Swiss-Prot record:
Domain of life: Archaea
Name assigned to this protein: Uncharacterized protein MJ1509
GO MF: protein heterodimerization activity
Organism in which the protein naturally occurs: Methanocaldococcus jannaschii (strain ATCC 43067 / DSM 2661 / JAL-1 / JCM 10045 / NBRC 100440)
Annotated InterPro entries: DUF1931, Histone-fold
Disulfide links within the chain: none
């Protein structure tokens, strides 16, 4: 199994707490692929927004975060404390994956764990919205959520 952004046992519990669905290891890896892609998409747009402003650094305002995303971010913020998730580990992992030639503002760097974790929650919440009665995430659910996020995020 590839390196996980958030350790599997914690991610499993987060999905159960925030989305009321179970997550197995194989599907956790599939969700991680979606999260990495969506994170890259967010920062591609942020990079473009910063360049359009002739900014020398990517700031939070450059990242296209919707109201729904920000609400999910607050949900993840409450869970990250309960689960004792090590934010520094997430920051280091994500910093290696972000495309672009502009540096990130310190506030953006500090928010990387929240942004990243929120994408996991958004994937889970999209799955739950499409399949209210499911108890366990399956590969086909992740594919559906990916399609929705490709249009919206």
């Amino acid at each position: 199994m590839a390196e996980m952004i958030i350790p599997y046992p914690q991610l499993k519990k987060i999905m159960k707490t925030t989305c009321e669905i179970d997550l197995y290891k194989t599907e956790a890896e599939d969700i991680m692929d979606v999260v990495e892609k969506k994170l890259a998409d967010l920062f591609e747009v942020a990079h473009r927004n910063a360049k359009e402003e002739n900014a020398k650094i990517i700031k939070m305002r450059h990242i296209p975060l919707t109201k729904g995303f920000l609400n999910s971010m607050e949900l993840f913020r409450s869970v990250i404390e309960e689960e004792n998730i090590v934010a520094e580990t997430i920051k280091k992992y994500v910093m290696k994956k972000i495309p672009g030639d502009l540096p990130l503002d310190d506030i953006v760097v500090d928010n990387l764990p929240l942004i990243t974790g929120t994408i996991f929650i958004v994937v889970g919440r999209v799955i739950k919205a499409l399949h209210e009665d499911i108890e366990r995430i399956r590969k086909e659910h992740i594919e559906e959520a990916k399609k929705v996020l490709d249009y919206t995020l």
